[in-house]
Amino acid sequence: MGAKFDIFKKLPDGHPLWVKAVDGLEEAKVQLARIAASSPGEYFIYSVRNACIVHARMVPQG
């Protein structure tokens, strides 16, 4: 089991919406890409261990 990461979607008002928890950064990136493909927007991956954002992705809508 790898390190824990949380995937969040940034809402239009700037607040984060928790999407899911994932084991391992590479798996978190794969899951983020899948989620963003079906629901475009701004997402980020948060490292639970390091208490910081480690990856962000913007998927334009439209």
Q: Where is each model-derived feature located?
A:
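Short, surface-exposed linear segments at secondary-structure transitions and domain or protein termini
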Residues: 26-31, 62
